[in-house]
UniProtKB/Swiss-Prot annotation:
A UniProt-annotated Pfam family: SBP_bac_5
Organism of derivation: Bacillus subtilis (strain 168)
Cystine connections: none
Gene3D superfamilies linked: Dipeptide-binding Protein, Domain 1 (3.90.76.10), Dipeptide-binding Protein, Domain 3 (3.10.105.10), Periplasmic binding protein-like II (3.40.190.10)
Lipid addition sites, N-palmitoyl cysteine: 21
Protein name listed in UniProt: Oligopeptide-binding protein OppA
Subcellular location: Cell membrane; Membrane raft
Family: Belongs to the bacterial solute-binding protein 5 family.
Induction: Positively regulated by TnrA under nitrogen-limited conditions.
Covalently lipidated residues, kind S-diacylglycerol cysteine: 21
Topology of this chain in the membrane: Lipid-anchor
Function: Part of the ABC transporter complex OppABCDF involved in the uptake of oligopeptides. Plays an important nutritional role. Binds peptides containing up to five amino acids residues regardless of their sequence, with highest affinity for tetra- and pentapeptides. Binds to the sporulation-promoting peptide PhrE (Ser-Arg-Asn-Val-Thr). Required for sporulation and genetic competence.
Protein backbone atom coordinates (compact mmCIF):
# COMPACT_ATOMS: atom_id res chain seq x y z
CA UNK A 1 0.00 0.00 0.00
CA UNK A 2 0.18 0.52 -3.52
CA UNK A 3 0.61 0.38 0.06
CA UNK A 4 0.28 -0.52 -1.10
CA UNK A 5 0.88 1.03 -0.37
CA UNK A 6 0.39 0.39 0.64
CA UNK A 7 0.61 0.01 1.78
CA UNK A 8 -0.19 0.78 0.31
CA UNK A 9 0.35 1.21 0.32
CA UNK A 10 -0.57 4.29 0.03
CA UNK A 11 -0.47 6.88 0.17
CA UNK A 12 -2.02 9.88 2.19
CA UNK A 13 0.54 10.46 4.92
CA UNK A 14 1.43 14.12 5.48
CA UNK A 15 0.21 17.69 5.67
CA UNK A 16 1.80 20.92 6.62
CA UNK A 17 0.02 24.24 7.04
CA UNK A 18 -1.54 25.58 10.18
CA UNK A 19 -2.36 29.24 10.52
CA UNK A 20 -0.81 30.97 13.51
CA UNK A 21 -4.19 31.70 14.98
CA UNK A 22 -5.55 28.22 14.32
CA UNK A 23 -3.56 26.20 16.84
CA UNK A 24 -4.37 26.62 20.47
CA UNK A 25 -1.43 24.59 21.76
CA UNK A 26 -3.40 22.43 24.18
CA UNK A 27 -2.19 19.20 25.70
CA UNK A 28 -3.19 15.71 24.61
CA UNK A 29 -6.61 15.97 26.14
CA UNK A 30 -7.34 19.27 24.37
CA UNK A 31 -9.46 22.19 25.34
CA UNK A 32 -13.12 21.32 25.69
CA UNK A 33 -12.34 17.58 25.76
CA UNK A 34 -15.24 15.59 27.10
CA UNK A 35 -14.75 12.83 29.63
CA UNK A 36 -14.01 9.74 27.55
CA UNK A 37 -13.68 7.17 30.32
CA UNK A 38 -15.43 3.95 29.45
CA UNK A 39 -17.02 5.18 26.24
CA UNK A 40 -17.60 2.69 23.42
CA UNK A 41 -17.59 4.85 20.28
CA UNK A 42 -14.29 5.78 18.61
CA UNK A 43 -14.24 8.92 16.46
CA UNK A 44 -11.46 9.17 13.87
CA UNK A 45 -10.66 10.93 10.59
CA UNK A 46 -9.70 9.10 7.38
CA UNK A 47 -9.36 12.28 5.27
CA UNK A 48 -10.87 11.19 1.96
CA UNK A 49 -13.25 8.84 0.18
CA UNK A 50 -11.69 5.35 -0.04
CA UNK A 51 -10.58 4.24 -3.50
CA UNK A 52 -12.44 0.95 -3.02
CA UNK A 53 -13.72 -1.11 -0.09
CA UNK A 54 -13.34 -4.33 -2.07
CA UNK A 55 -10.35 -6.28 -0.67
CA UNK A 56 -9.35 -7.25 -4.20
CA UNK A 57 -9.43 -3.68 -5.52
CA UNK A 58 -8.17 -1.63 -2.56
CA UNK A 59 -4.69 -0.25 -3.16
CA UNK A 60 -4.31 2.73 -0.84
CA UNK A 61 -3.95 3.49 2.85
CA UNK A 62 -7.47 4.92 3.22
CA UNK A 63 -9.20 1.87 1.77
CA UNK A 64 -6.88 -0.44 3.69
CA UNK A 65 -7.53 1.45 6.90
CA UNK A 66 -11.24 0.64 6.66
CA UNK A 67 -10.91 -2.92 5.34
CA UNK A 68 -8.51 -3.94 8.12
CA UNK A 69 -11.32 -3.25 10.61
CA UNK A 70 -14.05 -5.03 8.66
CA UNK A 71 -12.33 -8.07 7.12
CA UNK A 72 -9.89 -10.71 8.33
CA UNK A 73 -7.60 -13.08 6.46
CA UNK A 74 -6.45 -16.57 7.28
CA UNK A 75 -3.98 -14.83 9.57
CA UNK A 76 -4.01 -11.47 11.32
CA UNK A 77 -1.25 -9.22 12.68
CA UNK A 78 -0.90 -9.09 16.46
CA UNK A 79 0.35 -6.36 18.79
CA UNK A 80 3.96 -7.50 18.27
CA UNK A 81 3.65 -7.10 14.52
CA UNK A 82 3.69 -10.87 14.00
CA UNK A 83 1.14 -12.99 12.10
CA UNK A 84 -1.15 -15.21 14.14
CA UNK A 85 -4.13 -17.42 13.34
CA UNK A 86 -7.16 -15.47 12.13
CA UNK A 87 -9.84 -17.23 10.12
CA UNK A 88 -7.57 -20.27 10.17
CA UNK A 89 -7.26 -22.25 13.39
CA UNK A 90 -4.44 -24.43 12.07
CA UNK A 91 -1.66 -23.88 9.52
CA UNK A 92 0.45 -26.77 8.21
CA UNK A 93 3.52 -26.40 5.99
CA UNK A 94 5.14 -29.11 3.88
CA UNK A 95 8.77 -30.08 4.46
CA UNK A 96 9.89 -28.23 1.34
CA UNK A 97 8.07 -25.08 2.51
CA UNK A 98 6.05 -24.82 -0.70
CA UNK A 99 2.65 -26.19 0.32
CA UNK A 100 0.39 -24.67 2.97
CA UNK A 101 -2.77 -26.25 4.32
CA UNK A 102 -5.11 -23.95 6.23
CA UNK A 103 -7.92 -25.27 8.41
CA UNK A 104 -10.81 -22.81 8.75
CA UNK A 105 -12.02 -22.21 12.31
CA UNK A 106 -15.19 -23.88 13.47
CA UNK A 107 -18.23 -21.63 13.41
CA UNK A 108 -16.71 -18.57 11.70
CA UNK A 109 -19.37 -16.50 9.98
CA UNK A 110 -19.91 -13.52 7.75
CA UNK A 111 -21.65 -10.53 9.25
CA UNK A 112 -24.95 -11.73 7.73
CA UNK A 113 -24.62 -15.14 9.37
CA UNK A 114 -23.37 -17.08 6.34
CA UNK A 115 -20.51 -19.47 7.14
CA UNK A 116 -17.02 -18.41 6.05
CA UNK A 117 -15.66 -21.26 3.94
CA UNK A 118 -12.44 -22.21 2.21
CA UNK A 119 -14.27 -21.60 -1.07
CA UNK A 120 -14.64 -17.91 -0.13
CA UNK A 121 -10.85 -17.62 -0.03
CA UNK A 122 -10.31 -19.49 -3.29
CA UNK A 123 -12.95 -17.33 -4.94
CA UNK A 124 -11.44 -14.07 -3.63
CA UNK A 125 -7.87 -14.87 -4.65
CA UNK A 126 -8.86 -15.98 -8.14
CA UNK A 127 -11.12 -12.94 -8.49
CA UNK A 128 -8.13 -10.67 -7.81
CA UNK A 129 -6.04 -12.62 -10.33
CA UNK A 130 -8.66 -12.40 -13.06
CA UNK A 131 -7.17 -9.80 -15.46
CA UNK A 132 -10.69 -8.57 -16.26
CA UNK A 133 -10.97 -7.22 -12.71
CA UNK A 134 -7.81 -5.09 -12.97
CA UNK A 135 -6.65 -5.61 -9.40
CA UNK A 136 -3.58 -3.42 -8.83
CA UNK A 137 -2.41 -5.74 -6.07
CA UNK A 138 -2.80 -9.00 -8.00
CA UNK A 139 0.98 -9.35 -8.03
CA UNK A 140 0.90 -9.99 -4.28
CA UNK A 141 -0.57 -13.38 -5.18
CA UNK A 142 2.21 -14.27 -7.63
CA UNK A 143 3.87 -16.38 -4.95
CA UNK A 144 1.18 -18.97 -5.71
CA UNK A 145 1.87 -21.49 -8.45
CA UNK A 146 0.13 -20.46 -11.67
CA UNK A 147 -0.97 -17.07 -10.35
CA UNK A 148 1.22 -14.82 -12.49
CA UNK A 149 0.43 -16.75 -15.66
CA UNK A 150 -3.30 -16.45 -15.00
CA UNK A 151 -3.12 -12.73 -14.24
CA UNK A 152 -1.04 -11.93 -17.32
CA UNK A 153 -3.23 -13.95 -19.68
CA UNK A 154 -0.66 -16.69 -20.22
CA UNK A 155 -2.50 -19.29 -18.17
CA UNK A 156 -5.85 -20.25 -16.75
CA UNK A 157 -7.40 -19.41 -13.40
CA UNK A 158 -8.19 -23.12 -13.15
CA UNK A 159 -4.46 -23.79 -12.94
CA UNK A 160 -3.86 -21.45 -10.00
CA UNK A 161 -2.74 -23.70 -7.15
CA UNK A 162 -5.23 -22.62 -4.50
CA UNK A 163 -7.89 -25.22 -3.82
CA UNK A 164 -10.76 -25.48 -1.37
CA UNK A 165 -10.50 -29.20 -0.59
CA UNK A 166 -13.72 -28.85 1.38
CA UNK A 167 -15.52 -26.14 3.36
CA UNK A 168 -12.89 -26.29 6.10
CA UNK A 169 -9.65 -26.90 4.21
CA UNK A 170 -7.69 -24.62 1.87
CA UNK A 171 -4.59 -25.98 0.15
CA UNK A 172 -2.08 -23.59 -1.43
CA UNK A 173 1.02 -24.47 -3.48
CA UNK A 174 3.74 -21.85 -3.87
CA UNK A 175 6.38 -21.47 -6.56
CA UNK A 176 9.12 -21.30 -3.94
CA UNK A 177 9.45 -21.44 -0.16
CA UNK A 178 8.23 -18.08 1.13
CA UNK A 179 8.97 -17.61 4.85
CA UNK A 180 6.74 -14.54 5.08
CA UNK A 181 3.70 -16.14 3.41
CA UNK A 182 1.70 -16.11 6.65
CA UNK A 183 2.27 -12.34 6.77
CA UNK A 184 0.93 -12.07 3.24
CA UNK A 185 -2.22 -13.97 4.17
CA UNK A 186 -3.00 -11.19 6.66
CA UNK A 187 -2.90 -8.57 3.88
CA UNK A 188 -6.21 -7.40 2.48
CA UNK A 189 -5.70 -8.77 -1.05
CA UNK A 190 -5.70 -12.22 0.58
CA UNK A 191 -8.91 -11.63 2.53
CA UNK A 192 -12.04 -13.60 1.61
CA UNK A 193 -15.13 -12.50 -0.29
CA UNK A 194 -18.60 -13.93 0.27
CA UNK A 195 -18.96 -15.72 -3.05
CA UNK A 196 -22.75 -16.00 -2.85
CA UNK A 197 -23.18 -12.24 -2.35
CA UNK A 198 -20.52 -11.23 -4.88
CA UNK A 199 -22.03 -13.39 -7.62
CA UNK A 200 -25.53 -12.07 -6.91
CA UNK A 201 -24.51 -8.40 -6.81
CA UNK A 202 -21.41 -7.34 -8.75
CA UNK A 203 -21.52 -3.91 -7.05
CA UNK A 204 -21.81 -5.28 -3.51
CA UNK A 205 -18.78 -3.27 -2.36
CA UNK A 206 -19.92 0.19 -3.47
CA UNK A 207 -22.37 1.00 -0.66
CA UNK A 208 -23.31 0.02 2.87
CA UNK A 209 -26.31 -2.28 3.09
CA UNK A 210 -27.35 -5.90 3.33
CA UNK A 211 -24.91 -6.97 0.60
CA UNK A 212 -21.81 -5.38 2.12
CA UNK A 213 -20.91 -8.36 4.28
CA UNK A 214 -17.58 -8.77 6.03
CA UNK A 215 -15.93 -11.23 8.38
CA UNK A 216 -13.84 -8.97 10.63
CA UNK A 217 -14.36 -7.44 14.07
CA UNK A 218 -16.55 -4.64 12.67
CA UNK A 219 -19.19 -4.34 9.97
CA UNK A 220 -20.04 -1.29 7.89
CA UNK A 221 -23.53 0.05 8.60
CA UNK A 222 -23.40 3.44 6.87
CA UNK A 223 -21.39 5.07 4.08
CA UNK A 224 -22.05 8.66 3.15
CA UNK A 225 -19.78 9.00 0.15
CA UNK A 226 -17.09 11.66 0.60
CA UNK A 227 -18.55 12.35 4.04
CA UNK A 228 -18.35 9.54 6.59
CA UNK A 229 -18.34 5.80 7.24
CA UNK A 230 -19.87 4.10 10.28
CA UNK A 231 -18.63 0.75 11.54
CA UNK A 232 -20.34 -1.25 14.27
CA UNK A 233 -19.20 -4.27 16.23
CA UNK A 234 -19.72 -7.49 14.28
CA UNK A 235 -21.48 -9.87 16.65
CA UNK A 236 -20.76 -12.75 14.25
CA UNK A 237 -16.97 -12.30 14.62
CA UNK A 238 -15.27 -15.35 16.12
CA UNK A 239 -13.25 -13.25 18.62
CA UNK A 240 -16.06 -10.81 19.43
CA UNK A 241 -15.56 -11.07 23.21
CA UNK A 242 -12.29 -9.14 22.87
CA UNK A 243 -13.88 -6.39 20.77
CA UNK A 244 -14.80 -3.66 23.27
CA UNK A 245 -15.80 -0.83 20.94
CA UNK A 246 -19.41 -0.81 19.79
CA UNK A 247 -18.92 1.72 17.02
CA UNK A 248 -16.27 3.53 14.97
CA UNK A 249 -17.30 6.78 13.32
CA UNK A 250 -14.95 7.67 10.45
CA UNK A 251 -15.22 11.18 9.05
CA UNK A 252 -13.55 12.44 5.87
CA UNK A 253 -11.96 15.80 6.66
CA UNK A 254 -9.27 16.73 4.16
CA UNK A 255 -8.08 19.70 6.19
CA UNK A 256 -5.45 19.03 8.80
CA UNK A 257 -6.06 22.20 10.79
CA UNK A 258 -9.74 21.24 11.10
CA UNK A 259 -8.79 17.71 12.14
CA UNK A 260 -6.65 18.97 15.01
CA UNK A 261 -9.29 21.48 16.11
CA UNK A 262 -11.91 18.74 16.23
CA UNK A 263 -9.58 16.63 18.34
CA UNK A 264 -9.04 19.51 20.74
CA UNK A 265 -12.80 20.05 20.93
CA UNK A 266 -13.39 16.40 21.82
CA UNK A 267 -15.06 15.56 18.51
CA UNK A 268 -12.23 13.22 17.50
CA UNK A 269 -10.38 10.72 19.70
CA UNK A 270 -7.37 10.51 17.40
CA UNK A 271 -5.73 13.04 15.10
CA UNK A 272 -2.86 12.34 12.76
CA UNK A 273 -1.39 9.25 11.20
CA UNK A 274 -1.76 6.67 9.96
CA UNK A 275 -5.27 7.48 8.75
CA UNK A 276 -5.34 11.26 9.26
CA UNK A 277 -2.74 14.02 9.37
CA UNK A 278 -1.59 16.73 11.74
CA UNK A 279 -0.69 20.25 10.63
CA UNK A 280 3.08 20.29 10.52
CA UNK A 281 3.36 23.66 12.21
CA UNK A 282 1.61 22.18 15.24
CA UNK A 283 4.22 19.44 15.74
CA UNK A 284 6.81 21.42 17.75
CA UNK A 285 4.17 22.59 20.24
CA UNK A 286 2.56 19.16 20.52
CA UNK A 287 5.98 17.63 21.06
CA UNK A 288 6.84 20.21 23.70
CA UNK A 289 3.67 19.59 25.71
CA UNK A 290 4.25 15.82 25.60
CA UNK A 291 1.13 14.86 23.66
CA UNK A 292 2.79 14.05 20.33
CA UNK A 293 3.50 10.43 19.44
CA UNK A 294 6.31 9.86 16.90
CA UNK A 295 7.21 6.42 15.58
CA UNK A 296 9.45 5.50 12.61
CA UNK A 297 7.68 3.17 10.20
CA UNK A 298 8.59 1.12 7.15
CA UNK A 299 7.61 3.63 4.51
CA UNK A 300 9.10 5.96 1.91
CA UNK A 301 7.87 9.17 0.29
CA UNK A 302 9.04 9.51 -3.30
CA UNK A 303 8.37 11.15 -6.62
CA UNK A 304 7.66 8.73 -9.45
CA UNK A 305 8.97 9.52 -12.93
CA UNK A 306 7.01 8.53 -16.02
CA UNK A 307 10.01 7.07 -17.83
CA UNK A 308 8.07 6.93 -21.09
CA UNK A 309 7.36 10.67 -21.17
CA UNK A 310 9.89 13.28 -22.29
CA UNK A 311 12.18 14.48 -20.84
CA UNK A 312 11.90 11.89 -18.03
CA UNK A 313 12.72 9.10 -20.48
CA UNK A 314 16.33 10.25 -20.12
CA UNK A 315 18.00 8.68 -17.08
CA UNK A 316 20.45 11.57 -16.68
CA UNK A 317 17.62 14.09 -16.46
CA UNK A 318 16.00 11.89 -13.79
CA UNK A 319 19.28 11.73 -11.88
CA UNK A 320 19.81 15.47 -12.14
CA UNK A 321 16.39 16.16 -10.65
CA UNK A 322 16.92 13.58 -7.89
CA UNK A 323 20.44 14.58 -6.86
CA UNK A 324 19.56 18.29 -6.70
CA UNK A 325 16.98 17.89 -3.92
CA UNK A 326 17.83 19.12 -0.42
CA UNK A 327 16.02 16.48 1.60
CA UNK A 328 17.42 17.62 4.93
CA UNK A 329 15.86 21.03 4.35
CA UNK A 330 12.52 19.41 3.48
CA UNK A 331 12.33 17.30 6.65
CA UNK A 332 13.64 20.09 8.88
CA UNK A 333 11.65 23.02 7.54
CA UNK A 334 8.66 21.51 5.80
CA UNK A 335 7.53 18.14 7.20
CA UNK A 336 9.02 18.58 10.72
CA UNK A 337 8.02 15.09 11.86
CA UNK A 338 11.50 13.66 12.50
CA UNK A 339 11.58 11.97 9.09
CA UNK A 340 14.87 10.70 7.68
CA UNK A 341 16.17 11.93 4.29
CA UNK A 342 15.94 9.06 1.80
CA UNK A 343 18.69 8.34 -0.69
CA UNK A 344 17.55 4.74 -1.12
CA UNK A 345 14.32 2.85 -1.78
CA UNK A 346 14.17 0.40 1.15
CA UNK A 347 13.74 1.91 4.63
CA UNK A 348 16.65 1.30 7.03
CA UNK A 349 14.18 -0.24 9.49
CA UNK A 350 14.32 -3.37 7.30
CA UNK A 351 16.83 -5.98 8.47
CA UNK A 352 19.91 -6.05 6.25
CA UNK A 353 19.26 -2.54 4.97
CA UNK A 354 20.48 -0.52 7.94
CA UNK A 355 23.08 1.17 5.70
CA UNK A 356 20.26 2.88 3.85
CA UNK A 357 20.42 5.59 6.50
CA UNK A 358 23.28 6.89 4.33
CA UNK A 359 21.93 5.69 0.99
CA UNK A 360 23.41 5.44 -2.48
CA UNK A 361 24.16 9.10 -3.19
CA UNK A 362 24.73 12.39 -1.37
CA UNK A 363 21.83 14.57 -0.37
CA UNK A 364 21.70 18.00 -2.03
CA UNK A 365 24.54 17.13 -4.42
CA UNK A 366 23.99 20.04 -6.79
CA UNK A 367 27.43 19.74 -8.41
CA UNK A 368 26.80 16.17 -9.55
CA UNK A 369 23.21 17.04 -10.47
CA UNK A 370 24.46 19.72 -12.86
CA UNK A 371 26.82 17.22 -14.46
CA UNK A 372 23.94 14.81 -15.06
CA UNK A 373 21.82 17.66 -16.42
CA UNK A 374 24.53 18.67 -18.88
CA UNK A 375 24.94 15.08 -20.01
CA UNK A 376 21.19 14.61 -20.41
CA UNK A 377 20.79 17.83 -22.38
CA UNK A 378 23.61 16.79 -24.70
CA UNK A 379 21.99 13.39 -25.31
CA UNK A 380 18.73 15.16 -26.18
CA UNK A 381 20.43 17.62 -28.51
CA UNK A 382 19.64 20.58 -26.25
CA UNK A 383 21.93 23.34 -25.02
CA UNK A 384 20.28 24.62 -21.84
CA UNK A 385 17.68 23.70 -19.22
CA UNK A 386 15.12 26.12 -20.62
CA UNK A 387 15.10 24.05 -23.82
CA UNK A 388 13.67 21.04 -21.99
CA UNK A 389 10.10 19.99 -22.80
CA UNK A 390 7.54 21.28 -20.33
CA UNK A 391 7.57 19.37 -17.03
CA UNK A 392 4.55 18.99 -14.76
CA UNK A 393 4.79 17.85 -11.12
CA UNK A 394 1.53 16.27 -9.94
CA UNK A 395 0.21 15.45 -6.48
CA UNK A 396 -3.11 14.69 -4.82
CA UNK A 397 -4.79 17.68 -3.18
CA UNK A 398 -3.32 18.14 0.27
CA UNK A 399 -1.52 20.95 2.09
CA UNK A 400 1.48 18.75 2.85
CA UNK A 401 2.01 17.54 -0.67
CA UNK A 402 1.54 21.09 -1.94
CA UNK A 403 4.19 22.50 0.39
CA UNK A 404 6.67 19.76 -0.48
CA UNK A 405 6.00 20.27 -4.19
CA UNK A 406 6.52 24.02 -3.85
CA UNK A 407 9.83 23.45 -2.07
CA UNK A 408 10.95 20.99 -4.76
CA UNK A 409 9.83 23.36 -7.52
CA UNK A 410 12.00 26.08 -6.01
CA UNK A 411 15.01 23.75 -5.63
CA UNK A 412 14.86 22.63 -9.24
CA UNK A 413 14.62 26.21 -10.45
CA UNK A 414 17.42 27.47 -8.19
CA UNK A 415 19.81 24.53 -8.54
CA UNK A 416 19.26 23.51 -12.16
CA UNK A 417 17.32 26.29 -13.85
CA UNK A 418 14.53 23.80 -14.56
CA UNK A 419 10.98 25.16 -14.50
CA UNK A 420 8.16 22.84 -13.45
CA UNK A 421 4.43 23.40 -13.31
CA UNK A 422 2.49 22.17 -10.28
CA UNK A 423 -0.69 20.18 -10.79
CA UNK A 424 -3.04 18.80 -8.12
CA UNK A 425 -6.23 16.74 -8.20
CA UNK A 426 -8.43 14.84 -5.75
CA UNK A 427 -7.24 11.40 -4.68
CA UNK A 428 -9.41 9.14 -6.83
CA UNK A 429 -8.72 11.24 -9.92
CA UNK A 430 -5.03 11.42 -9.10
CA UNK A 431 -4.54 7.69 -8.55
CA UNK A 432 -6.23 6.99 -11.89
CA UNK A 433 -3.77 9.39 -13.55
CA UNK A 434 -0.83 7.53 -12.10
CA UNK A 435 -2.12 4.08 -12.98
CA UNK A 436 -2.76 5.17 -16.58
CA UNK A 437 0.62 7.00 -16.74
CA UNK A 438 -1.14 10.25 -17.52
CA UNK A 439 1.53 12.28 -15.71
CA UNK A 440 5.21 13.23 -15.86
CA UNK A 441 6.33 13.39 -12.21
CA UNK A 442 3.94 12.27 -9.48
CA UNK A 443 4.23 12.08 -5.72
CA UNK A 444 3.50 8.81 -3.98
CA UNK A 445 4.24 7.11 -0.72
CA UNK A 446 4.82 3.42 -0.15
CA UNK A 447 4.32 1.56 3.11
CA UNK A 448 5.40 -1.99 3.79
CA UNK A 449 2.53 -4.37 3.18
CA UNK A 450 4.48 -6.96 5.16
CA UNK A 451 7.78 -6.97 6.97
CA UNK A 452 10.20 -7.75 4.15
CA UNK A 453 12.40 -5.46 2.01
CA UNK A 454 11.08 -6.93 -1.24
CA UNK A 455 7.97 -4.83 -0.51
CA UNK A 456 9.67 -1.71 -1.81
CA UNK A 457 11.13 -3.26 -4.94
CA UNK A 458 8.74 -5.84 -6.36
CA UNK A 459 6.12 -3.29 -7.44
CA UNK A 460 8.66 -2.20 -10.09
CA UNK A 461 9.41 -5.71 -11.33
CA UNK A 462 7.15 -5.43 -14.40
CA UNK A 463 6.44 -2.18 -16.25
CA UNK A 464 2.75 -3.06 -16.55
CA UNK A 465 2.46 -4.42 -13.02
CA UNK A 466 -0.01 -2.91 -10.62
CA UNK A 467 1.38 0.07 -8.69
CA UNK A 468 4.49 0.45 -10.88
CA UNK A 469 3.13 3.49 -12.75
CA UNK A 470 6.59 4.48 -14.09
CA UNK A 471 6.80 2.42 -17.28
CA UNK A 472 10.22 1.23 -16.10
CA UNK A 473 11.52 -2.31 -15.99
CA UNK A 474 14.94 -3.93 -16.10
CA UNK A 475 15.69 -7.61 -16.89
CA UNK A 476 18.59 -7.88 -14.43
CA UNK A 477 16.52 -6.22 -11.69
CA UNK A 478 13.73 -8.70 -12.32
CA UNK A 479 16.18 -11.62 -12.37
CA UNK A 480 17.60 -10.63 -8.97
CA UNK A 481 14.13 -10.33 -7.46
CA UNK A 482 13.22 -13.76 -8.79
CA UNK A 483 16.45 -15.23 -7.40
CA UNK A 484 15.71 -13.68 -4.01
CA UNK A 485 12.43 -15.55 -3.91
CA UNK A 486 14.19 -18.90 -4.18
CA UNK A 487 17.15 -18.10 -1.90
CA UNK A 488 16.66 -19.54 1.59
CA UNK A 489 19.88 -18.16 3.11
CA UNK A 490 18.87 -14.83 4.70
CA UNK A 491 22.25 -13.15 4.20
CA UNK A 492 22.52 -14.18 0.55
CA UNK A 493 18.93 -13.15 -0.05
CA UNK A 494 19.59 -9.68 1.40
CA UNK A 495 22.61 -9.36 -0.90
CA UNK A 496 20.46 -10.16 -3.94
CA UNK A 497 17.92 -7.55 -2.93
CA UNK A 498 20.67 -4.98 -2.31
CA UNK A 499 22.00 -5.58 -5.82
CA UNK A 500 18.49 -5.12 -7.19
CA UNK A 501 18.09 -1.90 -5.25
CA UNK A 502 21.42 -0.70 -6.64
CA UNK A 503 20.15 -1.14 -10.20
CA UNK A 504 16.91 0.58 -9.29
CA UNK A 505 18.69 3.61 -7.83
CA UNK A 506 21.13 3.77 -10.73
CA UNK A 507 18.29 3.97 -13.26
CA UNK A 508 16.22 6.20 -10.97
CA UNK A 509 12.56 5.59 -11.95
CA UNK A 510 11.71 7.37 -8.69
CA UNK A 511 13.28 10.15 -6.64
CA UNK A 512 13.21 9.07 -2.98
CA UNK A 513 12.67 11.99 -0.62
CA UNK A 514 12.25 10.78 2.96
CA UNK A 515 11.51 7.76 5.12
CA UNK A 516 8.29 8.05 7.05
CA UNK A 517 7.42 8.48 10.66
CA UNK A 518 3.91 8.31 12.07
CA UNK A 519 2.94 11.40 14.08
CA UNK A 520 -0.32 11.60 15.99
CA UNK A 521 -2.17 12.60 19.16
CA UNK A 522 -4.80 10.48 20.86
CA UNK A 523 -7.26 10.55 23.71
CA UNK A 524 -5.36 9.73 26.90
CA UNK A 525 -7.95 7.09 27.84
CA UNK A 526 -7.75 5.21 24.52
CA UNK A 527 -5.82 1.95 24.88
CA UNK A 528 -5.24 -1.28 22.98
CA UNK A 529 -4.69 0.16 19.49
CA UNK A 530 -2.43 -2.09 17.40
CA UNK A 531 0.18 -0.31 15.24
CA UNK A 532 2.71 -2.88 13.95
CA UNK A 533 5.17 -0.40 12.41
CA UNK A 534 4.36 -0.90 8.75
CA UNK A 535 1.86 1.93 8.58
CA UNK A 536 -1.36 0.11 9.39
CA UNK A 537 -3.64 0.33 12.42
CA UNK A 538 -6.11 -2.11 13.98
CA UNK A 539 -8.86 -1.20 16.44
CA UNK A 540 -10.17 -4.69 17.25
CA UNK A 541 -8.68 -4.58 20.77
CA UNK A 542 -9.09 -0.84 21.34
CA UNK A 543 -11.00 0.44 24.36
CA UNK A 544 -11.42 3.48 26.58
CA UNK A 545 -10.35 2.82 30.14
Amino acid sequence: MKKRWSIVTLMLIFTLVLSACGFGGTGSNGEGKKDSKGKTTLNINIKTEPFSLHPGLANDSVSGGVIRQTFEGLTRINADGEPEEGMASKIETSKDGKTYTFTIRDGVKWSNGDPVTAQDFEYAWKWALDPNNESQYAYQLYYIKGAEAANTGKGSLDDVAVKAVNDKTLKVELNNPTPYFTELTAFYTYMPINEKIAEKNKKWNTNAGDDYVSNGPFKMTAWKHSGSITLEKNDQYWDKDKVKLKKIDMVMINNNNTELKKFQAGELDWAGMPLGQLPTESLPTLKKDGSLHVEPIAGVYWYKFNTEAKPLDNVNIRKALTYSLDRQSIVKNVTQGEQMPAMAAVPPTMKGFEDNKEGYFKDNDVKTAKEYLEKGLKEMGLSKASDLPKIKLSYNTDDAHAKIAQAVQEMWKKNLGVDVELDNSEWNVYIDKLHSQDYQIGRMGWLGDFNDPINFLELFRDKNGGNNDTGWENPEFKKLLNQSQTETDKTKRAELLKKAEGIFIDEMPVAPIYFYTDTWVQDENLKGVIMPGTGEVYFRNAYFK
